[in-house]
Amino acid sequence: MRLWGGRFAGGPAEALARLSISVQFDWRLAPYDLLASKSHARVLHRAGLLDADELAAMLAALDELSDAVAQGRFRPTVEDEDVHTALERGLLERLGTLGGKLRAGRSRNDQVATDLRLYLRDSAREVAARLTELSHALVVLAEQHVDTPAPGMTHLQHAQPISFGHQLLAHVQAFVRDIDRLRDWDVRASVSALGAGALAGSSLPLDPQGVAAELGFDRAFANSLDAVSDRDFAAEFLFVAALIGVHLSRLGEEIVLWTTREFGWVELDDAFATGSSIMPQKKNPDVAELARGKSGRLIGDLTGFLATLKGLPLAYDRDLQEDKEPVFDAVDTLLLVLPALTGTVATMRVRRERLVAAAPDGFALATDVAEYLVRRGVPFRQAHEAVGQFVSWCVAHDVDLDEVSDDDLGMINPLLTPDVREVLSVRGALEARSAPGGTAPDRVREQIAALRPVLDRDQAWAVG
């Protein structure tokens, strides 16, 4: 079935038909198209274009068609060009010529723009719900390891001791920002395009604002041409999805490192690890690696989508058929990765003894010595130089900072007196970072207390 044809003497060539068909991927928009159709039927009734009996019959047929779609009893055929064509066929099969009245005042251009917004607004909430679940899992693990010291790293080199809980919460902060972006995105996406027609609006007495309210949008379009041309909402969603992917990749990379024999900080549950087809001893962090790998796919969805939009003249162009697959792929990818990564985090076992042993490695307390000298009135540049000499001497003699004798301290630099030993403690180093947002255990507990209501708020938005 086609929604056009009177202008043409014959049907499209088979090659064109194969190229044009999109129902194999846009069928997932069917529930949203049917929802919008019910609102459009009601506005046609208010406009005097459907009488009360016709409206009742129309709504009953749309309800029955919705049930048939949901139960798989109605499916598109190879003759259906797209989701709109298939559903109109289903309506005509149920209502005959009355079903054709629903087309009045409506174009596939404003239909698809509205359907895609409805789909993405639901999908954004589903992604946010899965993100809050991952964040909750990280918070629970962080709470268990508020007092567990770990090597804090820069350039993947030992830098300063931190609370392992503090490191886990850093990932939560990124995910909270991602959810904030989804909520902020939703404000701009909450615009209905129904009533815009093909591009110029309609000469029929439609009610775009009323339809928008019925469909849960905050407002109707301000410019009919922009309404059918605009795909900013999809591009912006794809950016947020790509950034979520980047954040998942960074967490995945750390889990990969933590599970290596060289680090040995974390043991994965068997349910979230795989083996090797040839090496019997292997236990591979596939979930974390796939989270890392899928981020490239999400970035590709965004860049491919933007390339499609570049240079398009206003109103609908057939290029926009290509807008849906990257959007659908991004949603599917996130909803595939997030539960698996949540399960990985929720079940992995932290090897606390390995973290405690590694925390002071690599002269990680050197900064504490420098800051101790600063508190005694030594200019930081001089303190930095003295402690650099201290570390250099320890490297040359293969000893740690706390293994240097009093005599050797003075020989290395006169500023290094025996009382510097007071700060050569991992526990003291953690406690000393007590400024707001720091890694001191009390501050980490404050972070957890502050995050819980934020995540509860985000979960409420996601399911509301």
Curated annotation (Swiss-Prot):
It catalyses: 2-(N(omega)-L-arginino)succinate = fumarate + L-arginine. It holds the Pfam family Lyase_1. GO terms for cellular component: cytosol. Pathway: Amino-acid biosynthesis; L-arginine biosynthesis; L-arginine from L-ornithine and carbamoyl phosphate: step 3/3. Its main location: cytoplasm. It is found in: Cytoplasm. The keyword DNA-binding does not apply. It comes from the Bacteria. Keywords: Amino-acid biosynthesis, Arginine biosynthesis, Cytoplasm, Lyase. Its EC number is 4.3.2.1. GO terms for biological process: arginine biosynthetic process via ornithine; L-arginine biosynthetic process. InterPro entries: Arg_succ_lyase_C (IPR029419), Argininosuccinate_lyase (IPR009049), Fumarase/histidase_N (IPR024083), Fumarate_lyase_CS (IPR020557), Fumarate_lyase_fam (IPR000362), Fumarate_lyase_N (IPR022761), L-Aspartase-like (IPR008948). GO terms for molecular function: argininosuccinate lyase activity. Belongs to the lyase 1 family. Argininosuccinate lyase subfamily. NCBIfam families: argH. This is Argininosuccinate lyase. The gene is argH.
